[in-house]
């Protein structure tokens, strides 16, 4: 039996909606990264984007365990010499709740053109409303 190799034109991408309220950040991010990559499908091919679209709602209600809300650091650089900036989980979730989940999932995906295409298929929203009702996303319980 020959090995199946998916072709980009033949891949079917489904839409799923995930409710992040009360979920642990890391456990949620690993499952989302797995689905974006397409590893849950039998037609998974490493060099082809076989993953699904994921819509995450209630990103502001994602949780971390222990003292990570104060200890977990996020870094960014302004582009100027000495321009490294640091913030913790608590401040970032208050200011930009979508960025926490996006950074967690992005770090779990491959780096390069294929990984960039995968991260674009994840849509994160702080509240319960999202503009993707036309795609009829299925509820995914994680």
Curated annotation (Swiss-Prot):
Keyword tags: Ribonucleoprotein, Ribosomal protein
CDD domains per the UniProt record, alphabetical: Ribosomal_L13
Superkingdom per UniProt: Bacteria
Entry GO CC: cytosolic large ribosomal subunit
GO MF entry, a single one: structural constituent of ribosome
GO biological process: negative regulation of translation; translation
InterPro entries: Ribosomal_uL13, Ribosomal_uL13_bac-type, Ribosomal_uL13_sf
Record's subunit section: Part of the 50S ribosomal subunit.
Role summary: This protein is one of the early assembly proteins of the 50S ribosomal subunit, although it is not seen to bind rRNA by itself. It is important during the early stages of 50S assembly.
Family the entry assigns: Belongs to the universal ribosomal protein uL13 family.
PANTHER family linked: LARGE RIBOSOMAL SUBUNIT PROTEIN UL13M, RIBOSOMAL PROTEIN L13
The protein's name: Large ribosomal subunit protein uL13
Gene source species: Acinetobacter baylyi (strain ATCC 33305 / BD413 / ADP1)
């Amino acid at each position: 039996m020959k090995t199946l190799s998916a072709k980009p034109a033949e891949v079917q991408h489904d839409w799923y909606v995930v409710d992040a309220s009360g979920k642990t950040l890391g456990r949620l991010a690993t499952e989302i990264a797995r689905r974006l990559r397409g590893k849950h499908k039998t037609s998974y091919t490493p060099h082809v984007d076989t993953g699904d679209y994921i819509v995450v709602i209630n990103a502001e209600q994602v949780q971390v365990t222990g003292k990570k809300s104060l200890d977990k650091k996020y870094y960014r650089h302004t582009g100027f010499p000495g321009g490294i900036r640091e913030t913790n989980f608590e401040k970032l979730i208050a200011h930009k709740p979508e960025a926490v989940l996006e950074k967690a999932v992005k770090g779990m995906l491959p780096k390069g053109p294929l990984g960039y295409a995968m991260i674009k298929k994840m849509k994160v929203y702080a509240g319960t409303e999202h503009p993707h009702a036309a795609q009829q996303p299925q509820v995914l319980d994680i």
